[in-house]
UniProtKB/Swiss-Prot annotation:
Presence of keyword Zinc: yes
UniProt pathway annotation: Amino-acid biosynthesis; S-adenosyl-L-methionine biosynthesis
Enzyme class: hydrolase
Gene name per UniProt: dadD
GO BP: any one term: S-adenosylmethionine biosynthetic process
GO MF annotation terms: 5'-deoxyadenosine deaminase activity; 5'-methylthioadenosine deaminase activity; adenosine deaminase activity; metal ion binding; S-adenosylhomocysteine deaminase activity
Pfam family, one: Amidohydro_1
Note: SAH is a product of SAM methyltransferases and is known to be a feedback inhibitor of these enzymes. As a result of this inhibition, organisms have evolved efficient enzymes to metabolize SAH via different pathways. The pathway found in methanogens differs from the canonical pathway, it uses the deamination of S-adenosyl-L-homocysteine to form S-inosyl-L-homocysteine for the regeneration of SAM from S-adenosyl-L-homocysteine. 5'-deoxyadenosine is a radical SAM enzyme reaction product which strongly inhibits radical SAM enzymes.
Similarity remark: Belongs to the metallo-dependent hydrolases superfamily. MTA/SAH deaminase family.
Subunit structure: Homotetramer.
Reactions that this protein is recorded to catalyse: 5'-deoxyadenosine + H2O + H(+) = 5'-deoxyinosine + NH4(+); S-adenosyl-L-homocysteine + H2O + H(+) = S-inosyl-L-homocysteine + NH4(+); S-methyl-5'-thioadenosine + H2O + H(+) = S-methyl-5'-thioinosine + NH4(+); adenosine + H2O + H(+) = inosine + NH4(+)
Protein keywords: Hydrolase, Metal-binding, Zinc
Entry protein name: 5'-deoxyadenosine deaminase
Amino acid sequence: MADPKDISPCKNEDLFLKCRSTLITGVLLPDKTRSDIWYDETGTIRTCGPDIARNHRNEADIILDGSGFLAMPGLINTHTHAAMTLLRGYADDMHLQQWLSEKIWPLEAHLTGEHVYWGTKLACLEMIRSGTIAFNDMYFYMKDAARAVQESGIRAVLSHGIITFGDEAKMEAELKATEDLVHHVRSLNTSLITSAIAPHAPYTVPPQHLEVCADYSQKEKIIIHTHLAETKQEVDDCQKSYGMTPAALLDKTGCLTERTVAAHGCWLSEDDCRLLAERRVSVAHNPVSNMKLATGRAMPYHWLKDQGVNVCLGTDGCSSNNNLDMLEEMKTAALCQKFFWNSDTLLPAAEALSMGTSWGAKALGYQGGVIQEGMPADIVLISLSHPSMVPLHNPVSNIAYSAEGSVVDTVICQGKILMYNRYIPDEEKIIAGARESADDLLNRAGIMA
């Protein structure tokens, strides 16, 4: 795949060290055109189109033969809890509130920063292997998560999950954790990692604390990452307590803005959807998690689409999915919408692809999610010899409906090659460290590993 004069062995570690001027030749694009792609040492696409190689071959440090591959934008996971990879398979087939209160929250009480580091390392590895180059993360010990993300080379928006249940001292501590994270992320001096404030949900963070979160987001110009209308019980309880829907409550407290990413939205009303459109909120669809936890209703994509809401895609955490494969999530989203709302044309393949790429970039506040001049070189190369990609009548259809993570051959983020020929440096070390960390977490909780 690579020009022998540059990188002969497919596992040459020099390939992964830094971003270098790179030329990808003769690669297929989703619109079935053949193209060359040239990006510079800053990781910015300089130009793409036919016959570019003829003029720029001598300027490239690395030349990749793309003739057997399909190039697509890197996938963007707009809602997850990355370090919950350590909880994969720990608690399944339970009611949501029982799952949270009896299993997840008690185990999370034993988490340390080292657990979060290894869980996030494992998450980044899994995401890279399946073509994801950016994610929006809400969890704990996020400085340790930042260390893992920086080592992995992908993009992330990191936030400390705020849960207060009205406790003022708790809110003070949670805000301090967020402030520390924001300052820490800025000190890293990298454009790949940014921060957000994350009030968990209107049922775990009361109005007076939601207002604090909204004010801090406005002050620091950072994303608000939250859960919204995931279950009917959440909506009913909010109506009973406050006389309004969770969406209306978030709006009243200032938490609905163009910087808000609201996950789930399964039980949004039509009025809620109009409100989200007016406030230019992005909604992250998490169909696998929603179906596994039996939320009872699919996110009303048709209402959101009709109102012009930006809808993106997320996996949620591995304890409720149980993987981070965005290609699988893309297919599930399309099928879930068609089935639940009884519409064979709802959420077609092209929209599912946008949901996992360019619409996700918009939600996270950066230009990207497309392969074109001036955009970040966030590129995934899919093997056209993989059985699920044959035949290739419609590349977009294959990406949305037949592909899964194993079709991904090469992953590039901001020009840096993170996976090449399915090889990622230190993969065995990461898996061993994560396995040991998961066992340690259970031992700390007094659970037999």
